[in-house]
Amino acid sequence: MAKIVRIKGEIVGKDEPMVFTKEYNVLKENDALETMYSEIGSKHAVKRANIKVVEISEISVEEIQSPILKKTLEMN
């Protein structure tokens, strides 16, 4: 069964650290991590070593902050 995972972290190694929060609907936490590394790495041109994960947590549908993820789940 799918679960909703929230990842909080920061990108280091740039002029100033950038903080981010990402939410994914995945089967395993590892899938969410891989997707996050891929998205952040390609969008900001940083290596995985420069992406620091601060927190990974499973959240309920009511806690979702991402409007895109909310809309996607409502459609299903």
UniProtKB/Swiss-Prot annotation:
Swiss-Prot/TrEMBL GO biological process terms: translation
Gene3D superfamilies: 3.10.20.10
GO CC term (a single one): ribosome
Ribosomal protein as UniProt keyword: yes
Keywords: Ribonucleoprotein, Ribosomal protein, RNA-binding, rRNA-binding
GO molecular function: large ribosomal subunit rRNA binding; structural constituent of ribosome
InterPro entries in the cross-refs: Ribosomal_eL20, Ribosomal_eL20_dom
Stored Pfam families: Ribosomal_L18A
SUPFAM superfamilies in the cross-refs: RplX-like
Protein family according to the UniProt entry: Belongs to the eukaryotic ribosomal protein eL20 family.
Quaternary state and interactors: Part of the 50S ribosomal subunit. Binds 23S rRNA.
Protein name per UniProt: Large ribosomal subunit protein eL20
Organism: Methanococcus maripaludis (strain DSM 14266 / JCM 13030 / NBRC 101832 / S2 / LL)
